[in-house]
Amino acid sequence: MLQVKIGLIVGLAAPLFLLTGCFDSDNKTVPLAENDNNRIRLAMLLPPRSGLTPLSDDAFKLSRWSTAETLLNLNDEGNLTPALATEWHRLTPTAWRFQLRSEVLFHDGTPFNAKAVVNALNTAATAKPKPRILDGVDLTIEADGEYSVIVHTATPDPLLPQRLTSPQLSILSHNAYGDNGVINPINTGTGAFVLVNVHGTSSAQLNRFEGYWGEPAKAAGIDVSFVPDGLARASALRTHSVDIVEAIPVSQAPLLDPNLVHEVPMPRTNTLYLNTRQGVMADPAIRAAVRDAIDREQIVNTVYEKRADIAQGLLGPAIPWAAKLRQPIKHPTPAGHPNGAIITLATFTDRTELPEVAVYLAQQLTQAGFKVRQVVREYSQIEADALAGKFDAFILSRATVLDSGDPVAYMYSDFSCKGSFNIAQLCQLDIDNALEKASELPAGLERQQAIMDAEALILASDAAIPMLHERVIQGESAYVRHADRDPRERTLISNQTYLSTIIETSK
């Protein structure tokens, strides 16, 4: 590897940016843009939608900036690790005790302690609406000394510690919580970076927090721009205007230096749901015929330009333990003959790739002997009909783990008799029993195996045919070091992330 010192040639970089919109595969080095204060420039996909309140999806921005922190974290395997809490114990089926760090300060200089945790979690537990991680969960929190809290639930909840990893349950200082219900994260977190400015939906600035309880951040700060346009985000990376870019569109990735493009497996599966209650798909043999007709590789290679993973089950590579525990699926019903059966295949336009997926699926099903009618609308105009079972088949890009990092809630919602998102209209007692068993187990190998047992039953029904697992494309300049590539999109810039002044390139 060739190491190139670039400190002296920074000033020469700007004219080079104007020469071309594409990378030169023969060019081994690209000078670093003017950024001598080691601040990371970040282009994000979506602007804040709820004033950066941690009780909304904006919480994930606060965690990706390492400004707001939770009591616990999840590691790459989905296992719990300490954060603001160092220990956790289940006292009773409905009570958990959390031991807190004693050396932590909020960005405003106030101490982190049990009182602050009780205030933050009680605010979340009594919010209207609640953060989605607390849907159906009733919490009460009490201090147990200065650096310990006890969290009570109305019913046994073996996943309570996992829930507390959600960025929506970040702990901010008392000063963040206004009398009017507004929560202000500026200068009130505990993370490695202090949020100092937010300029509406255009930009934000963060500085290194010198009083951080962990290792101080290696970068001096973060300058955030919110850039919804995918072409603009990709162009910013190409022209060295930013250092890290969220969600580069698949169509733009080939135009970038491949060394700057990093694909991150997502816990999201593109799935074909089949109506098991009415119409031609109520026949298991016809569902099996659909299953056998699908050419996943064609869809991955064409629509996704090979930037997705062919599905082996409902849970993909973003959930590492799933493949290790998956057993071959036993399909009880052989494929029947479509004999020209007319089916309605539906999807929505909000995810731009799905209508194209529908075109390829229609071709494949037609070749298998079906007659296919396509229905494509905006999601807001089609969801109610999909849930009412008005289509024979529905293509959906579905998140398979929610905020707790556990798939049971998704499986229960989509495939149980009482599921609130049961597009397949599926109701089988053995599946319900398997999901009930999994839901009652504590986190760990036994629960994971129970989840995979439930997945096997769902796949054997052919009510849902997983096609592919999506990836998100993250862009990083050649000078970025140790940016997080997180399938859950909870972390991005940590205290270890920085910009190097030395670039390693191939000879």
Q: How would you label these PLM feature ranges?
A:
Residues F23, Y379-I382, Y412-A478, S506-K507:
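Extracytoplasmic/peripheral linker and loop segments enriched in polar/acidic and small residues
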Residues A43-T92, N122, T188:
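N-terminal lobe/hinge region of extracytoplasmic solute-binding protein
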Residues R97, R132-N175, N197:
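Surface-exposed binding/hinge segments that line
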Residues L164-P216, G221, L231:
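Gly/Pro-rich hinge or "lid" segments in bacterial periplasmic/extracellular proteins
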Residues F209-L255:
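Ligand-site clamp/hinge motif
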Residues R277-I319, E356-V357, I458-A463:
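Periplasmic-binding protein-like
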Residues E305-N339, T349-E356:
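Structural transition elements
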Residues Q474-K507:
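Long beta-strand-rich cores associated with HINT superfamily self-processing modules
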